Structures are given as structure tokens and as C-alpha cells.
Amino acid sequence: MSYPPERIVCLTEETVETLYLLGEQQRIVGVSGYAVRPPEVRRDKPRVSAFVSADVPKIMALRPDLVLTFSDLQADIVRDLVKSGIAVHAFNQRDIAGILAMIRMLGALVGCPDRASALADSLARRLDDARETTVGARRRPRVYFEEWDEPMICGIRWVSELIDIAGGIDVFADRARAPAATGRILAADDVIAAAPDVIVGSWCGKKFVPARVAARPGFAGVPAVQRQALYEIKSPIILQPGPAALTDGLDRLRTIIATCH
């Protein structure tokens, strides 16, 4: 691996967006098929992977000196790349602090630590400003965030933290801290008992269908269903642990939660 790396393959969205924001996009030679931020990435960079699968021969043909991955879900891809002699850095950020640390670490990896620190600091200030607007709110709506529908899976930790910053109460904040998605699987009775005022869906790449949620057995009595407060947030702006979640994702949450005041 050369330093700083000149040919980077990004197998998740957030490192792509971060490198563009740092002005280091010229280093990217391949991206995840889910990468959509900024829009030009779909035109300019070859796609080499889904999330849990990748075209390793295609990656190898790009002659990367560094591949960036995320979480244990890409462990098999990492194994194959390492066995092929490729340098890999696996990120595993699960909360806001981890997202900001990822930005700083990625900046260090590509030789622009000062720019990365400035970006992370500006995002942290933005979060603080948003938090200030909800401090002391007389009412904080109860929010159920659904990341997947079959089985029902509630939001991961950074989403839970963003709900709090946006002025809501995550009804499954305790589950959000689970180390794996299996710890966030819910039964319908869990949601019914939690009585959320708002349901926010982001079904990880497929369209959220409020009518399908409202029609679940027992959901007719859920406050969010009674007042038709079911909303979608597109996955690219909330489920990738990077700048998008801390900006557009947070803004969308704030707009949704504000409707319940």
C-alpha cells in the first residue's frame, strides 16, 4: 500500500461521499452500486459491489492500493481481498461519535487530516445547533423508526441519536445499542406496546409502504396509525453512517417530528 493511496475502491456509500467532500474524489477508482452522493458518482465511477457481495475480479482489475469496507457484513469480501494481497481498511462506526471519527480517520488515510478535522468539526457544530433548538421542548413525540419490515427491525444507534437531536424520543433506544441487527428485531406487540406518535420507515433500499404498516394486526390502535403519522426517509440519507445522515437525514427527521408538536 502506498501513502497516500492513489487508487481507492469504496464498498459503501459514506466513504465515497466523504472523499468527495474532502476534495479527494480523484483517488476513487470504484464504488458500491448503492453510492448516489454526490449524483455525479453514478456517472463517473465504476460500480463493483452490492453491500454483502462484490465482484472481486473487477476490483482487482482496477489495481487498488486501498479498499474501504464497513462492518462484519463485508467480512467475506475482506477475506477474499486480503488473500489476493489487497490492503483493506474496515470501518465499523455505529454512532454519531463514530461517524465523526471515521471522517477524521479517512482524512488521515488520504493525507488531508486538517481538512477532515474541519469537516468533522463543522458537522459537530451543526448537530449542536440542531440540538439547541429542541432543548426544553414541552413535548417530545415518541418515534418508532423501522429499518426493515420482515422481520421488523428498529433503528441503529446513530439513527436513535439523531431522533433525540431532532426533538423526538426513540421508543426503542435501548435496542439501538445492540451490536448486531439481530438484537434490534421486534415483535408486533413490542411496537403496539410502545405506542409511538410517529412511525418513520426506511426499508434499506426498498420503498416504505405506510398502508402495509397500518394494516398489521393490532396496529389500528397505535397513535401514529390513528393520526396517519407514517413517513418515509430514503435510505441513502439516513442508513449510511456518514455525512448524509448528519445533514439531510437529520433535517428530514426534524421536519417529520415538527409535525407532531
What are these regions (language model features)?
Residues M1-H261:
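N-terminal ligand-binding lobe of clamshell/alpha-beta domains
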